[in-house]
């Protein structure tokens, strides 16, 4: 039983990245799909797709990791900020920058998932899901 599915997703991506795997499979959900979409738009992963597995009711989100031409990892780190035991909410002016703006903070707002830059631009606050650099 997984208590925090987003932390589990981040851990699977981090571990696969450390082992230089080409892809990683995580149980699928709408929130995880939204996070994968942001990671792809920001260039941290190369692609993602939803796969259905026979004899299972839940589909799988397959994330294709991205590496440089020299084989180095593009995604240096990924961290969960708001946890199920301690939710972190920030207003649009208090949204944190990851590594001085070099990374991306993922925020869940009333308008859906978005990056910290989009939230500041639209002047929307929300729950800080995690950060990527």
Swiss-Prot record:
Listed GO CC annotations: ribonucleoprotein complex; ribosome
Entries under InterPro entries matching the protein: Ribosomal_uS8, Ribosomal_uS8_CS, Ribosomal_uS8_sf
Record keyword Ribosomal protein present: yes
A Gene Ontology biological process term: translation
Top-rank taxon, per record: Bacteria
Pfam short name (any one): Ribosomal_S8
A GO MF term: structural constituent of ribosome
Keywords: Ribonucleoprotein, Ribosomal protein, RNA-binding, rRNA-binding
Keyword Ribonucleoprotein in record: yes
Record note on quaternary structure: Part of the 30S ribosomal subunit. Contacts proteins S5 and S12.
Similarity field: Belongs to the universal ribosomal protein uS8 family.
Function field: One of the primary rRNA binding proteins, it binds directly to 16S rRNA central domain where it helps coordinate assembly of the platform of the 30S subunit.
UniProt protein name: Small ribosomal subunit protein uS8
Underlying gene: rpsH
């Amino acid at each position: 039983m997984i208590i925090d599915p987003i932390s589990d997703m981040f851990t699977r991506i981090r571990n696969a990245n450390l082992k230089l795997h080409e892809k990683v499979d995580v149980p699928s959900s709408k929130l995880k799909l939204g996070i994968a979409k942001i990671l792809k738009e920001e260039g941290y992963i190369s692609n993602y797709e939803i796969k259905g597995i026979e004899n299972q009711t839940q589909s799988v989100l397959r994330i294709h990791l991205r590496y440089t031409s020299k084989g180095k990892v593009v995604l240096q780190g990924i961290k969960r900020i708001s946890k199920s035991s301690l939710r972190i909410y920030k207003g649009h002016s208090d949204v944190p920058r990851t590594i001085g703006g070099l990374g991306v903070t993922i925020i869940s707002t009333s308008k859906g998932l978005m990056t910290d830059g989009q939230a500041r631009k639209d002047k929307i606050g929300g729950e800080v899901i995690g950060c990527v650099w």
